[in-house]
């Protein structure tokens, strides 16, 4: 397994307990009153005690990872991510909006932005499964289209001095340029620590067209871009028909397996 790093900078944003947890999940439809009560169906994966352990074994509250899915890629394609991070003591949140052909990247970015504060409210509600389990620290993460939308969300959050958002992580980030917006332009306003990981053989979102311009525009004092040698676009998640079809038509020279690419990715994400 090979990888290139530019530059080598690691930032430990969250202090998560080493205890291992089981994973539970619930779905909830949130409504954004500022956008005509737009409904944002959301999947929430959170730590619960292992079998035979008492609820007191939960060492919360737990930081949030808010994840944006790729174009035509269902949220459950990323089970590899919640299986990796939730047992370590993170809550992962997946909006299911903008999953069809006619996607609006700006709306998806606004969905992610909205959920940053909405999940905090969810943690304050005594009827919520994650009551008293939500830490203020939040990371935005996304793959492909969702990565680009994450930078659109971070733009506004950074400009407005949001105090929850602590880092942003992009996996094979796609430039989101629908409706006059641009993830590359939005990166100029992103001041939080940022990590971008790409596959060197990604022909869907070629790094020199998508990830590198975003990285170069970042105003973050701490930023890292990693290119996984021989890696592809779709290997950050589990198999998905539409993603894999697009990859087969556009990418050449992928020389590592999906498992290998995910292991390299986890090595760096866990350090970050």
Give the residues covered by each predicted segment:
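Sec-dependent signal peptide recognition
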Residues: 2-10
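N-terminal signal peptide c-region/cleavage motif recognized by signal peptidases
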Residues: 13-17
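Short conserved active-site loop signatures built around small residues
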Residues: 20-66, 91
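Gly/Ser-rich "nucleophile elbow"/oxyanion-hole loop immediately N-terminal to the catalytic nucleophile
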Residues: 55-61, 106-148, 156-160
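The conserved beta1-alpha1 loop
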Residues: 63-70, 96, 172, 198-199
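Short amphipathic alpha-helix adjacent to the substrate-entry channel of hydrolases
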Residues: 73-99
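The feature captures the conserved acid-bearing segment of alpha/beta-hydrolase catalytic domains
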Residues: 162-233
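C-terminal catalytic-base region of ester-bond hydrolases, centering on the histidine
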Residues: 215-272
């Amino acid at each position: 397994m090979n990888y290139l790093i530019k530059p080598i900078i690691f930032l430990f944003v969250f202090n998560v307990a080493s205890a291992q947890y089981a994973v539970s999940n619930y779905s909830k439809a949130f409504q954004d009153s500022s956008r005509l009560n737009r409904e944002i169906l959301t999947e929430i994966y959170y730590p619960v005690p292992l079998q035979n352990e008492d609820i007191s074994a939960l060492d919360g509250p737990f930081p949030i990872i808010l994840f944006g899915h790729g174009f035509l890629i269902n949220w459950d394609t990323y089970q590899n991510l919640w299986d990796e991070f939730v047992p370590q003591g993170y809550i992962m949140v997946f909006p299911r909006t903008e999953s069809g052909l006619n996607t609006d990247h700006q709306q998806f970015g606004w969905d992610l932005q909205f959920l940053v504060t909405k999940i905090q409210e969810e943690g304050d509600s005594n009827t919520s499964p994650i009551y008293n389990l939500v830490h203020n620290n939040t990371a935005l993460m996304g793959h492909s289209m969702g990565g680009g939308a994450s930078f659109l969300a971070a733009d506004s959050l950074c400009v407005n001095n949001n105090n929850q958002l602590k880092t942003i992580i992009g996996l094979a980030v796609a430039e989101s340029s629908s409706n006059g917006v641009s993830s590359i332009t939005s990166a100029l306003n992103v001041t939080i620590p940022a990590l971008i990981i790409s596959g060197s053989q990604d022909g869907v979102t070629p790094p020199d067209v998508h990830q590198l311009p975003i990285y170069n525009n970042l105003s973050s004092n701490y930023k890292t871009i990693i290119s996984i040698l021989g890696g592809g676009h779709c290997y950050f998640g589990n198999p998905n028909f539409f993603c894999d079809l697009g990859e087969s038509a556009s990418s050449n020279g992928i020389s590592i397996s999906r498992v290998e690419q995910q292991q390299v990715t986890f090595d760096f994400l866990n350090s970050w």
